[in-house]
Amino acid sequence: MDPCECAKTGTCNCGGSCSCTKCSCKSCKKSCCDCCPSGCSKCASGCVCKGKTCDTSCCQ
């Protein structure tokens, strides 16, 4: 799976244990989803946040 699928579609689902919406992680476990958690101050593994807002452009 493309680790940055969330950046393109705004949603992703990782193995049923994790989901993202608009690049915000919901019920994610450690190193489950490569998307940005709320606040964009810290990112899941493999994701870099750009700027201070968390939207579909915050993942690369």
Swiss-Prot record:
GO terms for MF: metal ion binding
Binding site for a divalent metal cation 2: 6, 12, 14, 25
Residues annotated for a divalent metal cation 5 binding in this entry: 33, 35-36, 49
InterPro entries from the UniProt entry: Metalthion_dom_sf, Metalthion_dom_sf_vert, Metalthion_vert, Metalthion_vert_metal_BS
Renumbered residue ranges of the record's region Alpha: 29-60
Residue sites binding a divalent metal cation 3 per the record: 14, 18, 23, 28
Residues bound to a divalent metal cation 7: 49, 54, 58-59
Keyword list, A-Z: Metal-binding, Metal-thiolate cluster
Binding site for a divalent metal cation 1: 4, 6, 20, 23
Domain of life: Eukaryota
Pfam families given in the database record: Metallothio
Region (Beta): 1-28
Residues binding a divalent metal cation 6, per UniProt: 36, 40, 43, 59
PANTHER family linked to this entry: METALLOTHIONEIN, METALLOTHIONEIN-1X
Family: Belongs to the metallothionein superfamily. Type 1 family.
Record remark: domains: Class I metallothioneins contain 2 metal-binding domains: four divalent ions are chelated within cluster A of the alpha domain and are coordinated via cysteinyl thiolate bridges to 11 cysteine ligands. Cluster B, the corresponding region within the beta domain, can ligate three divalent ions to 9 cysteines.
Role description: Metallothioneins have a high content of cysteine residues that bind various heavy metals.
Listed name of the protein: Metallothionein
Naturally occurring in which organism (per UniProt): Oreochromis mossambicus (Mozambique tilapia)
Gene: mt
